[in-house]
């Protein structure tokens, strides 16, 4: 007679084993209709799974995040159901849930076209609209293998052979004549899967190994209702307009090419923004009392073996050899910073020692994962490492947190999600050390009034960490900042300091990044601002245009004055209509467009308008320069008169 305890503390007693769906029906028909799955004693279960003993139960509906994930997973199975009807020879590989959707990797000789995707989506909807029940069967490993062998599903057989123990009891989910295998849970009925859209097709190697066969990956998105789907698609449409790759080309900021995959060719205007970002962070480093250093691009393999990176990262490291020595191009800066710390005797009086670098790093990311500036192989990291005593950890972490928020607010990012990752099962150090480390991070966050979520067991083996994820104007999440405690690397690389009692002690190392990769952060900014950079960041802040040739000399004089004032300015003296020139520079997103005619030249003025078409009237050039200087010094996100 199981007693079921609900989230509100109420209890329901049953005379026999019950499913989540039974409990929902006992509460009311509305909840039974909405029930997707259950969380039984903290574990997600299918709505049909029987509960035989006393348990705590949360009923999952489409209003819950887990409910949305489950219906997305079931949409992947629905895709499999439809594709096997349209192309019966298809072999199904894997179909997991991803952010905002799902995908399925398939092996099909026929190369799918956009027309095929539309036909597939139509068939999926036709099937879903029949509202058929999804039937779950738990079977033996052998029965599961026999089922897929009879269907010629070689990838499912490979998963069973290579990933699932022979004494396991896999779950098979039957969508009418289509059968799939999954740990679940899944929706009990396809009425939950009416609001989806197939988005794109890509290539993907089986098991992510380039030596294996290239499969076709079909991406889709799925939501609980029509409104949520429409909102998401509208957001994607806006994101496409803001795509940094598209805007980067329009504004001539950078390019990438096949001969250097994942490496950026910065053009003048893009490099101007990059340098401005670097200058901004450098001012922050000075404000927060950091040393700035520069380590070598390559170091001997021996050092990477001592640091432990060779075991964990060697596949992602570019290597070269010379004179019978093997070198690795650095994927990160930390071992180099420990080498700098180790030069000369350090005392407790030297701590905390804050060491920062704009480190040029390289990682051999898979070519299929490269994506504009967001995922590259060569990048610049605004990396810093703080060497301190254990007693100094909380204060140093608190300072890092302040620096993160101080920096992000300058760019207009206010919605920041913070997560604290705690001790994993496999770790160095004793529980007392981890207790102190985790408590120091918690206290630093609380001291700054930061709300945070704890991710149990997600920390690195060498220490807990804080992750800062910013949300942009389209509510997309970008994990950029990190503060990571490290109790291992200083010891591995022999870093010590002389303590107050003259003993040799190992410092705690704090890894700290604010922007992360400057390339990636610049990509985020391009999309956040849609290329309409605030004045202080804009590669060209002012363009001055003449109406006739008579004003050409005065225009050049004005631009020379602005440049002397440190304002990035240019002139446009082309023999074109002024409307044409204004339109062209508006498309280039130049913040201020200055027009000079006879009257402006005579009065030593300029007619000022913004890229948004706002007419600010006539100003003396000294007055305009003063206003712009104030904007730049304040790093204002708005233009004049906004």
Swiss-Prot record:
Protein function: Catalyzes the attachment of threonine to tRNA(Thr) in a two-step reaction: L-threonine is first activated by ATP to form Thr-AMP and then transferred to the acceptor end of tRNA(Thr). Also edits incorrectly charged L-seryl-tRNA(Thr).
One example GO MF annotation: metal ion binding
EC number per UniProt: 6.1.1.3
Protein's recorded name: Threonine--tRNA ligase
Cofactor annotation comment: Binds 1 zinc ion per subunit.
Gene: thrS
Predominant subcellular localization, coarse grouping: cytoplasm
Annotated localization: Cytoplasm
Residue segments, region Catalytic: 243-534
Cofactor list: Zn(2+)
An individual GO BP term: threonyl-tRNA aminoacylation
Cellular component, GO annotation: cytosol
Keywords for the protein's UniProt record, in alphabetical order: Aminoacyl-tRNA synthetase, ATP-binding, Cytoplasm, Ligase, Metal-binding, Nucleotide-binding, Protein biosynthesis, RNA-binding, tRNA-binding, Zinc
């Amino acid at each position: 007679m199981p007693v079921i305890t609900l989230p509100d503390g109420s209890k329901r007693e049953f005379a026999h084993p019950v499913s989540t769906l039974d409990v929902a029906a006992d509460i009311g028909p509305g909840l039974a209709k909405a029930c997707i799955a259950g969380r039984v004693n903290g574990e997600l279960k299918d709505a049909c799974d029987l509960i035989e003993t006393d348990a705590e139960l949360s009923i999952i509906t489409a209003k819950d995040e887990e409910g949305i994930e489950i219906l997305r997973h079931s949409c992947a199975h629905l895709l499999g159901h439809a594709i096997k009807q349209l192309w019966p020879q298809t072999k199904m590989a894997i179909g997991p849930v991803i952010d905002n959707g799902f995908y399925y990797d398939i092996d099909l000789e026929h190369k799918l076209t956009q027309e095929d995707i539309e036909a597939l989506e139509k068939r999926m909807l036709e099937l879903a609209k029949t509202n058929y029940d999804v039937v779950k069967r738990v079977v033996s490993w052998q029965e599961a293998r026999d089922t897929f062998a009879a269907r010629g599903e070689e990838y499912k057989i490979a998963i069973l052979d290579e990933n699932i123990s022979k004494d396991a009891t896999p779950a098979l989910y039957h969508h009418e004549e289509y059968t799939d295998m999954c740990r679940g849970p899944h929706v009990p009925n396809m009425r939950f899967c009416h609001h989806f859209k197939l988005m794109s097709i890509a290539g993907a190697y089986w098991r992510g190994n380039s030596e294996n066969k290239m499969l076709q990956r079909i991406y889709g998105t799925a939501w609980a209702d029509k409104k949520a789907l429409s909102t998401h698609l509208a957001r994607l449409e806006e994101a496409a307009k803001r795509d940094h790759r598209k805007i980067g080309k329009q504004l001539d900021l950078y390019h990438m090419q096949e001969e250097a995959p994942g490496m950026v060719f910065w053009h003048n205007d893009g490099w101007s923004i990059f340098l401005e970002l670097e200058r901004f962070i450098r001012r922050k480093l000075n404000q927060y009392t950091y040393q700035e250093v520069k380590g070598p691009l390559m170091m001997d393999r021996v050092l990477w073996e001592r640091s432990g990176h060779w075991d964990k990262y060697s596949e992602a490291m570019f290597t070269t050899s010379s004179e019978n020595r093997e070198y690795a191009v650095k994927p990160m800066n930390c071992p180099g910073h420990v080498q700098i710390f180790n030069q000369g005797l350090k005392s407790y009086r030297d701590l905390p020692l804050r060491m920062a670098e704009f480190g040029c790093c390289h990682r051999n990311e898979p070519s299929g994962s490269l994506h504009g500036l967001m995922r590259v192989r060569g990048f610049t990291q605004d990396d810093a490492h703080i060497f301190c005593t254990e007693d100094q950890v909380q204060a140093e972490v608190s300072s890092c947190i302040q620096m993160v928020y101080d920096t992000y607010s300058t760019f207009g990012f206010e919605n920041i999600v913070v997560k604290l990752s705690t001790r994993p099962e496999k770790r160095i150090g004793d529980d007392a050390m981890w207790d102190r480390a985790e408590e120091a991070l918690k206290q630093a966050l609380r001291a700054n009034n930061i709300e945070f979520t704890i991710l149990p067991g997600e920390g690195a083996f060498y220490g807990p960490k804080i992750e800062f994820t910013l949300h942009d104007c389209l509510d997309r999440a970008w994990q950029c900042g990190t503060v990571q405690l490290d109790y291992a690397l200083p010891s591995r690389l022999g870093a010590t300091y002389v303590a107050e009692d003259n003993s040799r002690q190992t410092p705690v190392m704090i890894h700290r990044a604010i922007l992360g990769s400057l390339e990636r952060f610049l990509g985020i900014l391009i999309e956040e601002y849609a290329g309409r950079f605030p004045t202080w960041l804009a590669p060209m802040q002012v363009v001055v245009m003449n109406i006739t040739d008579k004003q050409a000399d005065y225009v050049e004089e004005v631009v020379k004055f602005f440049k002397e004032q440190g304002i990035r300015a240019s002139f446009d003296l082309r023999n074109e209509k002024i409307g044409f020139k204004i339109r062209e520079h508006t498309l280039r997103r130049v913040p201020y467009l200055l027009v000079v005619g006879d009257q402006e030249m005579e009065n030593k003025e300029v007619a000022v308008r913004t890229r948004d078409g706002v007419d600010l009237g006539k100003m003396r050039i000294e007055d305009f320069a003063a206003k712009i200087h104030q904007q730049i010094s304040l790093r204002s996100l708005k233009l004049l008169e906004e």
